[in-house]
UniProtKB/Swiss-Prot annotation:
It is found in: Cytoplasm. This is Glycerol-3-phosphate dehydrogenase [NAD(P)+]. One of its GO terms (biological process) is carbohydrate metabolic process. Pathway: Membrane lipid metabolism; glycerophospholipid metabolism. The gene is gpsA. Keywords: Cytoplasm, Lipid biosynthesis, Lipid metabolism, NAD, NADP, Nucleotide-binding, Oxidoreductase, Phospholipid biosynthesis, Phospholipid metabolism. One of its GO terms (molecular function) is glycerol-3-phosphate dehydrogenase [NAD(P)+] activity. The active site is at K199. Catalyzes the reduction of the glycolytic intermediate dihydroxyacetone phosphate (DHAP) to sn-glycerol 3-phosphate (G3P), the key precursor for phospholipid synthesis. Belongs to the NAD-dependent glycerol-3-phosphate dehydrogenase family. Signal peptide: none annotated. Its EC number is 1.1.1.94. It holds the Pfam family NAD_Gly3P_dh_C.
């Protein structure tokens, strides 16, 4: 089989490496819009901008022609969109314009579209109505507790592919389920995508708590009550609340809220230290999806009539309406309730 990955950031590189370890030379293709980046990767054997120090497996094909990267795939192959959430709409529209037959398409981004609060699959469905030219593609999301750097070097990892198409799930497993990576399947696209979005916001909250030295008790409270918020929203949005107890919910939440490689956790730590959000984002150099989707998650919760106090406080902190220590006071000052 052949695999094409669109986007040569950290995740595109990591998953390209994972597929290349298993498939034949030339079967895996990585596309980037930047000719300079492709040249640097070709000359150095690594992605120094995103995954410095990690040598890519031999046999990976680099491509700068978008149309060629897509058209090399047959109906049994796999297209992976490895852009951030902010680039999903543009990328899928471009794919649909050049695709000549049905494709198996997955995305790696986690979050909601700003301004619309749409989930990734809803963005894809919207663009499909405009650009698909009558061709029906299979879609899905690949998500779970994983840092790109660890995947890039082949450390053990477990992910979940979510799709209404059993065939697509099988194609994704054929591409990535080998060596130190396990890929489970699910039909709960809503639950998987919302879990991946909300956990990023909660990881910022956990980082703030750790940065303010609130203790391990506080961290446990944030994660547990945050998980309850996640489950409520998933159920209200039409997903399965039990999905939140799996890899893409509590699994990804634990990793992102406690792991030192987490950009979202780092945002929380530095907010607690008194740094401004623009200053923090400039120092990161990469996307922290929780910053971009906190307001969108809050908007979706309001639309569905779901109370999410931790998420709401993070939106106020990130928008500059509330200081981190004041957010803690507001949360701790809430009226007592039955645990649910």
């Amino acid at each position: 089989m052949k695999v094409t990955l669109l986007g040569a950031g950290a995740w595109g590189m990591a998953m390209a490496a994972q597929a290349t370890r298993h498939l034949q030379e030339g079967d895996v293709c990585l596309w980037s819009r930047s000719k300079e980046q492709l040249l640097d990767i070709q000359e150095s054997g690594e992605n120094r901008a995103y995954l410095s120090g990690i040598k890519l497996p031999e046999g990976l094909k680099l491509e700068g022609d978008f149309s060629a990267a897509v058209k090399r795939l047959s109906i049994d192959d796999l297209l992976v969109i490895a852009t951030p959430m902010s680039g999903l709409s543009e990328t899928i529209a471009q794919v649909l314009r050049v695709a000549e037959h049905p494709l198996n398409i997955i995305w790696l981004c986690k979050g909601l579209e700003p301004n619309t609060a749409l989930l990734p699959h809803q963005v894809v469905e919207r663009e499909s109505k405009i650009h698909s030219h009558g061709i029906t593609h299979s879609y899905g999301a690949l998500s779970g507790p994983s840092f790109a750097r660890e995947v890039g070097v082949g450390m053990p990892c477990a992910l979940t592919v979510a799709s209404k198409s059993p065939k697509l799930c099988e194609v994704v497993q054929a591409a990535f389920h080998h060596g130190n990576m396990r890929v489970y399947s699910s039909d709960d696209l809503i639950g998987v995508e919302l879990g991946g979005a909300i956990k990023n916001v909660l990881a910022i909250a956990a980082g703030i708590g750790d940065g303010l030295d609130l203790g391990l008790n506080a961290r446990a409270a944030v994660l547990t009550r945050g998980l309850a918020e996640m489950m409520r929203l998933v159920k209200a949005a039409g997903g399965k609340s039990e999905t939140c107890m799996g890899l893409t919910g509590v699994g990804d939440l634990i990793l992102t809220a406690t792991g030192d490689l987490s950009r979202n956790r780092r945002v929380g730590l530095e907010l607690a230290a008194g740094k401004s959000l623009p200053e923090i984002l400039a120092s990161l150099g990469h996307v922290a999806e929780g910053v971009l989707c906190a307001q969108a998650v809050g908007d979706l919760a309001k639309r569905l009539g779901i109370e999410m106090p931790i998420t709401a406080m993070m939106d106020e902190v990130l928008s500059g309406k509330l200081k981190p220590h004041d957010a803690v006071k507001k949360l701790m000052g809430r009226d007592p309730k039955i645990e649910s």
